[in-house]
A protein has these predicted regions:
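Conserved mixed alpha/beta catalytic, RNA-binding, or beta-rich assembly cores of soluble enzyme
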Residues: 1-2, 14, 20, 98, ...
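Iron-sulfur cluster-binding cysteine motifs and their immediate structural context
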Residues: 72-90, 99-116
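Ferredoxin-type iron-sulfur electron-transfer modules and their immediate structural context
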Residues: 1-83
Length: 272
């Protein structure tokens, strides 16, 4: 984590988004501070939180006692954070990318939901003091979104930005139209606007798919082209399957303010 954040800082990114865990943030800050001294770049540190069940907030697990002694351990090889060893999966290193789930030849690895409680969120904010927060939400979760925003407000942490991440069809059992997403984003704007903090709207095309193929950015580009011009005031960021090829699908006369590329960047630094 420290090395990755140092490299991202050297590359000149605007924000580095990490899990809302003290140990991870501590490592990220060390990497950022080292690179700042050398390259003079100074990205903001953003933490991700959620207002409910979210595929971005999962971790992997398995019982190491069930592993055969002669296993080639493909799970270790595909893990981008080196969270897996002979003792199992280190919870504080796993960020839920899901790569290991299909790597096990015996299907011993499963995932579970992991999220901060309301009380944990308040104390974590005080410990971490991030520059920005990204709230992962769902079209149908307006009440829980209000509660998270209220926690942010009461924390009195001085944030430079608040990002809201939402997309279509994040739940398999229920699909939505772009108009539904646009309505949901405007509802969240009305809630966030009173905080007087600059906003970022993240359009999630393929939420935490783990798919790194070049064309995976088409979904978020299509979503941006449909509703981008009608979004509330704030910066627009594309995410979910985005990578170094995503900009090729964009119209040069209609560009977003930014593109997230976490999985693609990790692939370059830590090839599978």
């Amino acid at each position: 984590m420290k090395d990755l954040c140092a490299i991202y800082t050297a590359a000149g990114v605007n924000y580095i988004d990490v899990a809302a865990e003290v140990s991870i943030v501590r490592a990220a800050k060390k990497g950022i501070e080292w690179a700042k001294k050398v390259f003079k770049n100074s990205p903001g540190l953003m933490i991700s939180i959620s207002d409910g069940d979210d595929i971005h907030f999962r971790k992997a697990k398995f019982d190491p006692l069930r592993c055969p002694p002669n296993c080639p351990r493909p799970c270790e090889k595909v893990c981008p954070t080196s969270a897996i060893d002979n003792s199992g999966i280190k919870e504080n290193k796993c960020y839920g990318c899901g790569r290991c789930l299909n790597s096990c030849p015996l299907n011993l690895i499963s995932d579970y939901e992991y999220n901060l409680s309301k009380d944990d969120l308040a104390s974590t904010l005080q410990k971490i003091k991030p520059d920005a927060v990204e709230i992962h939400t769902d079209i149908d979760r307006i009440d829980s979104f209000k509660k998270v925003v209220n926690t942010l407000k009461n924390s009195e942490i001085k944030l430079k930005n608040i990002s809201t991440s939402c997309g279509l069809n994040q739940k398999v059992q229920k699909s939505h139209e772009p108009e539904d997403l646009l309505k949901a984003i405007w509802e969240r704007y009305e809630i966030l606007n009173e905080l007087k903090i600059p906003l970022i709207w993240q359009l999630d095309g393929r939420p935490m798919s783990g798919d790194l193929a070049p064309a995976t950015g088409r979904n978020t580009v299509n979503l941006f082209e449909k509703i981008g011009s009608d979004l509330p005031p704030g910066l627009i960021q594309l995410a979910g399957g985005t990578n170094e090829k995503t900009h090729e699908f964009l119209n040069s006369k209609n560009l977003p303010d930014g593109i997230a590329f976490g999985s693609a960047a990790r692939k370059i630094m830590q090839p599978l």
